[in-house]
Amino acid sequence: MHSLYTTSLAYPHVPTNSVAVCDLALSFGEGSDGDRKKRMSRPFGVALLLAGYDELEGCQLFFSDPSGTFVRYKAKAIGAGSEGAQSNLEESYSESLTLSEAQDLALSTLKQVMEEKISTDNIELARVTPDKGFHIATKEEITEALGRL
C-alpha cells in the first residue's frame, strides 16, 4: 500500500504526467514494489477496493482479490455479507445517481447486510470527486447521512 501511495504522490510533481487509477491497480495486482523479480507473485492475500480519479477515465473503482487479480466496477461490495450487498448494488445502482444518492445507497446496503446496528462506530465513509479529491467523512457527516435513511 505504501508503494501505491508514494507512486500516486509523485505524479503531481511531474508536469506532463498523471498516474492513471488503472495503472495503480495493475501495480498493486502485480505486487510491484520496484523489484522486477517479485512481480506477478501473490501480493498480500487480501481483498481491496481501490478508488480514484484521473483525467483520462474520471472516477474509477477497482477490486483486487487475494490472488492479485483486479477488475473495474461501478459499485462493489467485499467482506462479510458481500453477496447480499452486491445483489442490492446491482439492482439499485445507476450512473445517474447523485453523490448524495450513491452515498445513501451505500449506507442502506450496509444497513441491510450488517449484523449489528449501523453507526458511526462501525462504518467509515469516503468519496473521490474530481474537484475535491479523496475525502474521508467525519463522524458528523456520517451521522447526517445516516439521518437521511
What are these regions (language model features)?
Residues 1-149:
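Long, low-complexity N-terminal extensions
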